[in-house]
Amino acid sequence: MSMVYANIFLAFIMSLMGLLMYRSHLMSSLLCLEGMMLSLFVMMTATILNNHFTLASMAPIILLVFAACEAALGLSLLVTVSNTYGTDYVQNLNLLQC
């Protein structure tokens, strides 16, 4: 494994650890998810370019489309939660609480 792939994999792991550790606020969780999607995009693009997969050249674009949809839904959820509860705590999303 080259150093480029190791650094990209390390960025993915750091974003995953940030998502697992700092999950009190919704904004920090969304930021960690975006970091994970960015590292997946770079890893997929580098793999396709290095291995000359011409048929799979649309896969990073499709991943970016899904990342944009995920970001839009996450931000709309953030606005809804912050308007309803006044904060962006993730514990406000628990539907079982009274």
UniProtKB/Swiss-Prot annotation:
Catalytic activity, as annotated: a ubiquinone + NADH + 5 H(+)(in) = a ubiquinol + NAD(+) + 4 H(+)(out)
Enzyme class: translocase
E.C. code: 7.1.1.2
GO MF terms, alphabetically ordered: NADH dehydrogenase (ubiquinone) activity
Keyword Transmembrane on entry: yes
Bilayer topology: Multi-pass membrane protein
InterPro entries per record: NADH_UbQ_OxRdtase_chain4L/K, NUOK/Mnh_C1-like
Main location: mitochondrion
Keyword Transport (UniProt): yes
GO terms of biological process kind: ATP synthesis coupled electron transport
Keywords on record: Electron transport, Membrane, Mitochondrion, Mitochondrion inner membrane, NAD, Respiratory chain, Translocase, Transmembrane, Transmembrane helix, Transport, Ubiquinone
Entry GO CC: mitochondrial inner membrane; respiratory chain complex I
Record-linked Gene3D superfamilies: 1.10.287.3510
Transmembrane regions listed in the UniProt entry: 1-21, 29-49, 61-81
Compartments it resides in: Mitochondrion inner membrane
Record note on quaternary structure: Core subunit of respiratory chain NADH dehydrogenase (Complex I) which is composed of 45 different subunits.
Membership in a protein family: Belongs to the complex I subunit 4L family.
Protein purpose: Core subunit of the mitochondrial membrane respiratory chain NADH dehydrogenase (Complex I) which catalyzes electron transfer from NADH through the respiratory chain, using ubiquinone as an electron acceptor. Part of the enzyme membrane arm which is embedded in the lipid bilayer and involved in proton translocation.
Name listed for the protein in its UniProt record: NADH-ubiquinone oxidoreductase chain 4L
